[in-house]
C-alpha cells in the first residue's frame, strides 16, 4: 500500500508483552517459554508472555498466590517487576523508532505513534522494516499498524 501526496499517514508501534519481552531479552534461555511479571511485592500478575497466556487463564492483576502452584507445574517463570529495566528498554525502543521518522509521539512505555506522512515507500514493507530493525537493535518483538487519512 503506498500513499499519495495529499494523504496523512500514521503508524502505531506497540511492543508485544513489553515487560515479559524485556525479561526474555536478557534471559535468552526463556525466549519462547512462559514468563510472567509480577507487581511490586509480587502480589499479582501485571504482564505475561504469549506462551504464558496460552497455558494459564491469567487476567490482569490476578493474584499470584492463586496461580503460583499451577504455574510452577507448567514451567512458568515469574519475575519481580523491574521498572528501571523497562524504562531503559523503552528508551531504546523510542530511539530506534526515531531512525524512521522525526515525527513521533510516545503514547506509553511500549507504544508510539509515528507520522509517516509523505513517505514514498510501500507502507507494509516499511512496517516490516521497522519491526525487523526494532527486533535487531533491541530484541523486542513489535507490532506495527498503519492508517491513511
Regions found by a protein language model. Name each.
Residues 1-113, 119, 130-138, 146-149:
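Residues that scaffold, gate, or flank divalent-cation-dependent active/transport sites
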Residues 121-126:
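Short, conserved charged micro-motifs
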